[in-house]
Amino acid sequence: MVEFSLAWVACNDGTGRMKTVGIAVWGGWWWWAMFLAVAPVLADGPAPTEAESGTSGFAQSGEVKIHYVTRGQGPLVVLIHGFPDYWYTWRRQMPALSESFQVVAMDQRGFNRSDQPEGVEQYSMEKLVGDVRAVIRHFGQDKAVVVGHDWGGAVAWSFAMTHPEMTDRLVILNLPHPNGLQRELATNPEQQRNSAYARNFQKPGAASQLTAEGLARWVTDPAARTNYVEAFQRSSFEGMLNFYKANYPREPYTLPVSEGPKVKCPVLMIHGLNDRALLPGALNDTWKWLEKDLTLVTVPGADHWVQQDAADLVTRTMVAWLRR
């Protein structure tokens, strides 16, 4: 069965306002948007193994070592995973991206081979953003394309807002802008119900309920699932849940007090519409919090892990957008 995605492009109209368009002019900035609007979600081929994916290394972020896998040469692209996940979530995107870029897929602190400091305060957004900054500096670069999924998306949003000079472009997968999520938590009963898992993760003792096998249940590829179980066995369950304890909004949910700084670089968002944890209503009005172009690609039939559910489409979308 062939499914179709729809690309919406929000661009600055030259007056400081944003307008939304659904088509593009061939040969112009947005020539590829029309192609994406009818691009089928194709069946995915075999994924590279961990060993085939790239070269492993470590960057120092304060007292914490951050593990990464890198391949390719060119401008730097930093890939940031979410929960429960690790760098290998990008295995289907890394080969194509590395043809034009140096791709660095990092393990966030607490996960897999990165250090796992103790204490909720060690997982503040400031610390997580600092890890991305350290990775970019480790490769001798002043800026990078920053790509994030789930919690990696939250870190990427925050990095772009606090380090605009280091953010070339921003790619976000299945993670609304923080203002959009907070608005939905405050006003949308369905989002409140669907966020019960996050409230449970914030409770004392929640980590004792987790197992590596349980965290890997969503992985459909048997070979990859084995890798995931091993990665989660190396991880800190307390560290994983500290992302929620340190950064996820708590009840009573309220509207954002401050919208924060606007993102100053172009943004690509890709969102699988079957995601029940992060409902698509939170995507509304994202353009209000950006200074430049927003391209939003929604993917029917794809779940929360859109980079794996619709790997071919996500890869081609990212490559086309980054090469424009």
Predicted ranges, named:
Residues 27-40:
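Bacterial N-terminal signal peptides
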Residues 70-113:
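Conserved HGGG/HGGXW glycine-rich cap/lid loop of the alpha/beta-hydrolase fold
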Residues 18-24:
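Positively charged n-region of N-terminal signal peptides that target proteins for export
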Residues 302-310:
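Catalytic histidine-centered segment of alpha/beta-hydrolase-like enzymes
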Residues 2-4:
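Extreme N-terminal basic, low-complexity initiation segments
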Residues 57-72:
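Mature N-terminal segment immediately following signal peptide/propeptide cleavage
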Residues 45-53, 64-66, 76, 104, ...:
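Flexible "cap/lid" subdomain of the alpha/beta-hydrolase fold that forms the substrate-access gate
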